[in-house]
């Protein structure tokens, strides 16, 4: 077991070096996935398992405190981008077995209050992503190592070179989404039956995605603030780089990253 953990630590060092412009090669891309899988596989057994990675990260496969958003917030619209191929990678992301959204019970309860308030104003919530398994984050890391794969650059990061995505924080080894109380969403206008114009698209890497970006219309800015105010009024905190991203301030698992897949069955087993 010690050999596997040591290999995992070594691979992370290689990944970090490559992403900082110190040299990337195909061998790094190919070895990163199996090494990371050692840690993730331990936390994906039939019975809930908790493990600690070499970097100190607590991993867990226990889904017992999670719920499906389709049940907790039934009027929410789901467009799970990482289940589709329309995302910055261009492929379905590892760990997304079904187009469902999952959150901790606490986050889902708070989101239901947000939804109820916005319904009175003529809006529904549209969810792009919620709980994200650690396996998916590893998928992002491996994709970032392959600097030749720029299929989706014109749609999601036209202003940036791919090799800066990790140093600038767009891609990271761990994501708050994996703790289960973070989600990405927008507003859906029930009158027009269209998404509200936010002056930018989900997962666009650049300043355009900052909530307070100045070069959008007054209406687009106001729409961003409607979403932001509704979320913060019910205990969610925003991210200053992404208008769509919110985390429950009192999240129940601030130090645990979960590994179970995104699927109905994963939650029903919890």
Residue ranges: model-predicted function:
Residues 22-130, 135-241, 250-270:
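Extracytoplasmic cell-surface/polysaccharide-interacting catalytic and binding patches
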Residues 3-25:
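Sec-dependent N-terminal signal peptides of Gram-positive bacterial secreted proteins and lipoproteins
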Residues 246:
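Conserved metal-phosphate-binding beta-hairpin within the catalytic cores
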């Amino acid at each position: 077991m010690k050999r596997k953990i040591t290999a995992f630590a070594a691979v992370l060092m290689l990944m970090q070096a490559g992403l900082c412009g110190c040299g990337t090669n195909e061998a790094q891309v190919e070895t990163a996935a199996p090494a990371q899988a050692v840690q993730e596989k331990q936390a994906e057994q039939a019975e809930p398992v908790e493990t600690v990675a070499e970097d100190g990260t607590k991993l867990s496969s226990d889904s017992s405190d999670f719920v499906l958003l389709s049940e907790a917030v039934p009027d929410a619209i789901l467009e799970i981008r990482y289940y589709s191929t329309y995302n910055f990678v261009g492929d379905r992301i590892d760990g997304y077995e079904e187009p469902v959204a999952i959150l901790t019970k606490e986050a889902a309860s708070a989101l239901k209050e947000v939804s109820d308030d916005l319904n009175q104003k003529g809006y529904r919530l549209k969810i792009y992503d919620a709980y994200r398994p650690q396996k998916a984050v590893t998928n992002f890391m491996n994709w970032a190592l392959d600097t030749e794969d720029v299929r989706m650059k014109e749609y999601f990061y036209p202003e940036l070179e791919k090799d800066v995505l990790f140093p600038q924080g767009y891609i990271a080894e761990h994501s708050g989404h994996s703790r289960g109380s973070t989600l990405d969403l927008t507003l859906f206008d029930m009158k027009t039956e269209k998404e509200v114009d936010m002056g930018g698209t989900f997962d666009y890497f650049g300043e355009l995605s900052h909530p307070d970006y100045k070069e959008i219309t007054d209406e687009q800015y106001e729409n961003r603030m409607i979403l932001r105010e509704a979320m913060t009024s019910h205990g969610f905190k925003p991210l200053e780089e992404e208008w769509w991203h919110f985390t429950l301030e009192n999240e129940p698992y601030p130090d645990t990253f979960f590994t179970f897949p995104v699927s109905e069955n994963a939650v029903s087993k919890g």
